Amino acid sequence: MYTFILPTSSEIELREMTGAEEELLTNQKLIRSGDAVNQVLKNCIIRIGENEDVSLTNVLDMLSGDRLFTLVKLRQISLGDEVDLELTCPNTACRAKNRATVNLDDLPVTPYGEEREFVFTLPASGSKVRFVYLDGHKEKRLAQMQEHSISSAMMIRILDIDGNTPSKKALNEMSMRDRSALRQEMLRVDAGIDTTIEFDCDSCGSHIRTKLEAEPSFLFPGVRL
């Protein structure tokens, strides 16, 4: 068993992934519903703090930064620290294959503070927005939405705007200045492990940016999915 300290400062104990978890992570129905990762986390988490009977609800209660941190650590203990990437250049005139190796121990981790709710005053309208961190419940709701949009991703974290329940209409009518400022504030207070990978194409110099967990080789090295 392996023990780590989560970004929320709780201790977590994990076991390695097995073939059962590999099957879950390749089940397209579970992937679309958002249940694949949740079930893998439930299977492989032995303990969170003093809780040795970790349920699916406990997994969904985890903040997103803790969840991604746990997934990265599961990858490390199951498959090793290094991830070999093959990324296609986004430049349509190039499309060269670029290879890179990432050491998961090098990914920066930002701990969570004590606050769980935040109030932000929008610069243009002066409205006050109360919002929270993303957690597993909200991630699952986002995965099940038929339409993925910037408004949906923002709204799912908002508790109220000037005391009123947020709506898609309110988000769509919000000025771009206010929306941009709110997104930046959400990013500023977010914590957890940063899985952003950035480098320049070897052939043309175009910038390549991706999230490590979005790449097949993160969980399936050497396998073409």
Predicted features and spans:
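Short, surface-exposed, charged amphipathic helix/loop patches that serve as local interaction elements
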Residues: 1-225
